[in-house]
Curated annotation (Swiss-Prot):
Function per UniProt: Catalyzes the transfer of the enolpyruvyl moiety of phosphoenolpyruvate (PEP) to the 5-hydroxyl of shikimate-3-phosphate (S3P) to produce enolpyruvyl shikimate-3-phosphate and inorganic phosphate.
Active site: D314
Name of protein: 3-phosphoshikimate 1-carboxyvinyltransferase
Domain of life where this protein originates: Bacteria
A GO term for molecular function: 3-phosphoshikimate 1-carboxyvinyltransferase activity
Length: 426
């Protein structure tokens, strides 16, 4: 296995333009494909997850032109639901942002589809979405294990009426149903069971649906109504915001080490909840400055904080390694859904933090980190999880090197992450 050893970084400073947001890129690609007209997406993320979505759209007969650097994509929409005369198998890697929304969208038209992916994808639950789709008349079957991909979908359309979705495990199930709902037979009402996790990701979905011409009535995140008679219309130009989760590593680096880092491509009016990471960092003692399309982080003396991160679970991972440099205890609470991400992130984070010497308590839905005076040089296993690799790169901001196993796993969302980090390291 390939590994990368990062030597201690003395100082960080500079500016980094963020790659496009994964969450925004894949939502916008799908809605552009379902639209009438042509959408020109700029600052599209070039990564594995986006590639899986683009490959699937190609198989589904969608025309698009991709620029040489793969960050500009012109999509000609099919003007409604996908249909296919031949049976198709779509391989979606480990891309939840492709698997879940496509599972819902493919129920709308005609055709027979198998949705599959990497071994880890077959361990990531999808049962709450499938239950809701079946409630709306969809024909979906599990090909291996109940409640998990791979799925076989026979397009039959989605009925109007009321469905219930359990929101307690992943907001992607609701996102998937919301994006398919305007193309159902009539008005759709979605009722939420349990506590809806990651609400800011639903805000992203609703915002992008509106940009493509569809209005959703949001009754306090308990019920969503998609009125009948709507369809997706290409907005023409669509700018993909920089990825807020990717910003977290650089903002944390400046807060930990001093110097000043400016991230561009995202700002105070971002539609991504993960930008609230900067608020958490500020609570820890960092100095944060906001602009319309940038955020600046400067050094503060960091202290541990105890916080609920249910609203920003992805960015919260960066807090776990930032905690190694804070005075006192840091508690990250209400993040059960870390367990159903690219890996079981609670178990993985606890294991790897202990390797570098931290005292860690891992609970069912929380992690508590106590730093140590001197970190230990360790080889960090990344579990084929891009965020594990990027989070643990921050260990190099100590006086101790860190070795990252399988650094290439960052290709899921940020292929040139380590190059960007090197550019900012003095």
């Amino acid at each position: 296995m390939e590994s990368l050893t990062l030597q201690p970084i003395q100082k960080v400073s500079g500016e980094v333009n963020l790659p496009g947001s994964k969450s925004v890129s894949n939502r916008a690609l799908l809605l552009a494909a379902l639209s009438t007209g042509t959408t020109r997406l700029t600052n599209l993320l070039d990564s594995d997850d986006i590639r899986h979505m683009l490959n699937a759209l190609t198989q589904l007969g969608v025309d698009y032109q991709l620029s040489a650097d793969k960050t500009v994509c012109e999509v000609t929409g099919v003007g409604g639901a996908f249909s296919s005369d031949k049976a198709l198998e779509l391989f979606l890697g480990n891309a939840g942002t492709a698997m879940r929304p496509l599972a819902a969208a493919l129920c709308l038209g005609r055709g027979e589809y198998v949705l599959t992916g990497e071994p880890r994808m077959k361990e990531r639950p999808i049962g709450h979405l499938v239950t809701a789709l079946r409630e709306a008349g969809a024909d979906v079957e599990y090909l291996e294990n109940e409640n998990y991909p791979p799925l076989k979908i026979t397009g039959t359309g989605l009925k109007s009426g009321t469905v219930s979705i359990d929101g307690s495990i992943s907001s992607q199930f609701l996102t998937a149903f919301l994006m398919a709902a305007p193309l159902a037979e009539g008005e759709v009402t979605i009722k939420i069971e349990g506590e809806l996790v990651s609400k800011p990701y639903i805000d992203i979905t609703l915002h992008i649906m509106k940009q493509f011409g569809v209005d959703v009535i949001n009754n306090d995140y308990q019920e969503f109504v998609i009125p009948t008679g709507q369809s997706y219309t290409a907005p023409g130009d669509f700018l993909v915001e920089g990825d807020a989760s990717s910003a977290s590593y650089f903002l944390a680096a400046a807060a930990i080490k001093g110097g000043e880092i400016k991230v561009t491509g995202i700002g105070k009016n971002s539609i991504q909840g993960d930008i609230q990471f900067a608020d958490a960092l500020e609570k820890m003692g960092a100095e944060i400055e906001w602009g319309d399309d940038y955020v600046i982080s400067r050094c503060g003396e960091l202290k541990g904080i105890d916080m609920d991160y249910n609203h920003i679970p992805d960015a919260a991972m960066t807090i776990a390694t930032t905690a190694l440099f804070a005075k006192g205890t840091t508690a990250i609470r209400n993040v059960y859904n870390w367990r159903v991400k690219e890996t079981d992130r609670l178990a993985a984070m606890a294991t790897e933090l202990r390797k570098v010497g931290a005292e860690v308590e891992e609970g069912e839905d929380y992690i508590i980190v106590n730093p140590v005076a001197e970190l230990t040089h360790a080889a960090i296993d990344t579990y084929d999880d891009h965020r594990m690799a990027m989070c643990f790169s921050l260990v190099a901001l100590s006086d101790t090197p860190v070795t990252i196993n399988d650094p290439g796993c960052t290709s899921k969302t940020f292929p040139d992450y380590f190059d960007k980090l090197k550019m900012l390291s003095l």
